[in-house]
Amino acid sequence: MSGDRFYFKLALHRCINEIWYGRNFWQYLLVPFACFYGAVVWARKMAYESGVLNVFRARVPVLVVGNVSVGGTGKTPLTIWLASRLTDFGFKPGIVCGGYRGRAKSWPQQVRADSDNYVVGDEAIILAANTSVPVVAGPDRGQSVKALLEKHDVDIVLCDDGMQHYALARDIEIAVINGVQRLGNGKLLPAGPLRESRERLAEVDMIVCNGIPARGEFAMKYKADELRKVGNTE
């Protein structure tokens, strides 16, 4: 049964990729749902910006790293790099993240390199293991920032994957884009891969491209720190 489930997920993933990143007529059938989704996203954003919904503002600057599309674009590696560079320049950064796939009974959670990934999720542990700064995980970014500032001496907060979390005020926004897939077919979910419209990118302070950048974007490249033996080879 587990094998059947694996192949089903693989087939579903391929189907979604064809719709989002290729030319597939199914994307047009999903456009009405994308319009509804876009209206909800816009209304939610306006509710925070107009003060209808409360926004938490930290006493220190908040730098958000995020994107407008679903999937991995390099947000976490960039957050790790920023934490390292800020530390080198004498700042005392702290990181908050969503705790994606974590199953903690209560949030937010203080994260260490040896924390249980079942509780806080893999990404939170990756952040803690690859930086020397405090990390707090939780789906409510505002509460996570509060917990971070209450327990740690931090003078700047890095928020990993936080662009759509408008309940948290931010001072700087960095959007990360996959240099190969870019924005796919340019449509909103579920017709395309976008969480927000491409126009949202005009509001950010910087666009970082994980790959070959377009005009006005900054390039990002992965660089290996070390080689590790992962198998028993003679």
Q: Where are the model-predicted features located?
A:
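A transmembrane-helix-recognition feature enriched in membrane-embedded lipid enzymes
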Residues: G3-P61
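Residues at alpha-helix boundaries and short interhelical turns
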Residues: R23, S69-T73, V135
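Generic non-transmembrane alpha-helix signal with a bias for helix starts/N-cap capping motifs
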Residues: V40, T79, V120-G121
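Short N-terminal or domain-adjacent regulatory/targeting segments
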Residues: W42-L53, A214-E234
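Walker A (P-loop) phosphate-binding motif
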Residues: K45-A113
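Short, well-ordered turn and helix-capping elements at secondary-structure junctions
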Residues: N67-S69, M163, A224
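Phosphate/Mg2+-binding loops and adjacent switch elements
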Residues: G99-A219, E226-G231
